[in-house]
């Protein structure tokens, strides 16, 4: 199981195929996504890579966080997240993962924080039908109606769908196809919509419900400090 990457949502556009058909895509940008730490079975009880992306000033950063980046010899990162991997998919600390970590045509799962909508009523939040337009209904056309029973159960159950805060939820969208890659600019174009607003942080990883293409680099495509892009050679029959 390979590592994913941390990207930022740039926005949506469209690309055209050779047949003239257009494909709506979301542009994701890798902002110097580097490995900042390892999690091992012996020390932590599980195997994972800790990745960081973006840049951050150290003025208001806690000393413990500054020390973490100093040990890894990488610049302080705005966003830090962990990705579970197998032991054979570890990438050296300090390596920068590139956009061609994925291949065109493969499917990925993306996770982000949905756009906040504020306080919303039942019709917008839960797609309720509302009340009638006439026949005695006044003012309450968009209300949700009754929320409970009578004497029994004598209360409104927890998790009842009611008006409230909408959005700002952690959303995962499965099986988005990679349409194009721009390694020089660190761009990944995936087909369809990605949850979150422009500039939001997005976790991108190999799709869990689709097979990984054979041409996908293992453990990944990355660039070490002062070196060329590297990827471990995949052994035949491994």
From Swiss-Prot:
PROSITE patterns: RIBOSOMAL_L3. GO terms for cellular component: cytosolic large ribosomal subunit. Residues 140-164, 212-238 are annotated as: Disordered. The modification N5-methylglutamine is found at residue 151. It comes from the Bacteria. Methylated by PrmB. Keywords: Methylation, Ribonucleoprotein, Ribosomal protein, RNA-binding, rRNA-binding. GO terms for biological process: translation. One of its GO terms (molecular function) is structural constituent of ribosome. Residues 225-238 have a biased composition (Low complexity). One of the primary rRNA binding proteins, it binds directly near the 3'-end of the 23S rRNA, where it nucleates assembly of the 50S subunit. Belongs to the universal ribosomal protein uL3 family. Part of the 50S ribosomal subunit. Forms a cluster with proteins L14 and L19. This is Large ribosomal subunit protein uL3. The lineage of its organism: Bacteria, Pseudomonadati, Pseudomonadota, Alphaproteobacteria, Hyphomicrobiales.
